[in-house]
């Protein structure tokens, strides 16, 4: 079981939109140095909707090869086609990924039974730990707690990333899942609350900008050091909120670029962060103690 701060890592790109693999590898080294507990590649924050199939493969393979066992690599392998999700998951296992993150199928709006059959088919086709990803604000389909509990009985399905931000719902899930099934926060603003209720970690956007602090917050929460966990969360709270003033990953790429780690290039239809938000995010970074 993976625990702690798992970064939903950005995908660096050159000004012409090509993948910047040199900076991608440098980011992995940065997160290892900063004590990040795991890396999630080619997820929402990694711009999975706008990388093609070959690039998706390349990013997963590069992450696994460069990490070289120094940090767990969780590959984003979700798709709204079950066959495509299986193919990506097979590739990830063969590439050496430690686990996969599989988002609920988007746009085609399956029923709860359709969701169950989708994830069951992937788990039966590929022997790799799978974390479900529930983000109804993007997918317009919601993995209910009851469906998550059904899926938790399937070998290989080891956890869920809950990006609803609904703490009552997360608490309900934590009380009902088996001990070997992990519940991760997918909402930075409520991550600490979920951790204190028994959550196992966070798959974090904020960790791109403040990786060591996110790791330390998780560590403090697990140790029962509420004062320290709250202190860190207070420092980070504006980042938790302001990194979503426009669609993720627009703001976080701007912030990571200010740190000198990447440039802030995005692929259409995403566009550069509106100038009206530059100062807002700069102040949030300064509040967190990040040099801008």
UniProtKB/Swiss-Prot annotation:
Query: Where along the sequence do coiled-coil regions lie?
Result: none
Q: List the disulfide bonds.
A: none
> What reactions does this protein catalyze?
L-aspartate 4-semialdehyde + pyruvate = (2S,4S)-4-hydroxy-2,3,4,5-tetrahydrodipicolinate + H2O + H(+)
Which GO cellular component does the record give, naming just one? cytosol
In the UniProt entry, which residues are flagged as the active site? 133 (proton donor/acceptor), 161 (schiff-base intermediate with substrate)
Q: Which residues cross the membrane?
A: none
Keywords, in A-Z order: Amino-acid biosynthesis, Cytoplasm, Diaminopimelate biosynthesis, Lyase, Lysine biosynthesis, Schiff base
User: What EC number(s) is this enzyme filed under?
Assistant: 4.3.3.7
Note the site residues: Part of a proton relay during catalysis.
44, 107
- Which positions carry the signal peptide feature in this UniProt record? none
Q: In which pathway does it act?
A: Amino-acid biosynthesis; L-lysine biosynthesis via DAP pathway; (S)-tetrahydrodipicolinate from L-aspartate: step 3/4
Q: In its UniProt record, which GO terms are filed under biological process?
A: diaminopimelate biosynthetic process; lysine biosynthetic process via diaminopimelate
Q: Report the locations given in the UniProt record.
A: Cytoplasm
Provide the binding site for pyruvate: 45, 203
Q: Which domain of life is it from?
A: Bacteria
What does the annotation say about its assembly with partners? Homotetramer; dimer of dimers.
HAMAP family, A to Z = DapA
Q: What does this protein do?
A: Catalyzes the condensation of (S)-aspartate-beta-semialdehyde [(S)-ASA] and pyruvate to 4-hydroxy-tetrahydrodipicolinate (HTPA).
Q: Which family does it belong to?
A: Belongs to the DapA family.
Q: What protein name does the entry list?
A: 4-hydroxy-tetrahydrodipicolinate synthase
Name the species this protein comes from: Nitrosomonas europaea (strain ATCC 19718 / CIP 103999 / KCTC 2705 / NBRC 14298)
